[in-house]
Amino acid sequence: MLLAALLALAPAAPAVAGPIAVRFPEGIVHGFLVLRSARGESLAHGEFTQTVRGDHLESALVFRFIDGSLYDETATFTQRKVFRLMAYKLVQRGPSFPKTSEVAFDRGSGRYRARAGNDTADGKLEMPEDLHNGLTGILLKNLPAGAAGSGHIVAFTPKPLLVNTTLRKEGEDRFLLGDAPRTATRYLVHLDVPGLKGVAASLMGKDPPDLRYWVATGPVPAFLKFEGEMYLKGPRWVVELAAPRWPAAPSR
């Protein structure tokens, strides 16, 4: 009872309502990633690229799996004072996924098209200003210290479902860079299906699982790690930064 009372009196993290403000502007990026199973098995290698096209930025994440599967995600956004998602595309195919799926939506037209296996859907799509499909890691780097954020993502089955999201700091973890200890902030991204569909999901024990991101602290925040599902009802995967491997030098 005392613990409950203390928790009730503890101040909650200040919430950032609406789109996340730009604190660290994005630019040209090219990084390398590895995707592993929860048991640590290497499943895929990936690349993250970001390009600037006028006042729009295009963020692309591609994983090529050992079994031939493909995960190809592209988010186009602007960063005039706040981050604003303008367009999104996602392709998932191959044996690592239950079925081939393709999704695309665009704020300019206000429309979407989606395919999951043999099922297709298209039409008008509600796109809140704080929609962040493909931008979650960027938003977490820009959250003010100690603040929580909220937003939305769209899930497709293939019909669209708007999901509420809460982004908050969960804790801190130590990691090593060489022998030097560093600190990473661990963020929790909570997904919540609103309305009667959310109630039904809770009753059936099918609430969307939480996602976790690790971001290096300091004056220049940097993505370190992701852990969670990358498709509906999928396994828990881990994404981390990867270092290139060099072929053995020939003997001289």
What are these regions (language model features)?
Residues 1-11:
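Bacterial N-terminal signal peptides
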Residues 2, 128, 144, 193-198:
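Serine/threonine-rich low-complexity intrinsically disordered regions
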Residues 17-107, 150-252:
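Acidic, serine/threonine-rich low-complexity disordered tracts
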Residues 112-151:
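Surface-exposed beta-loop interaction hotspot
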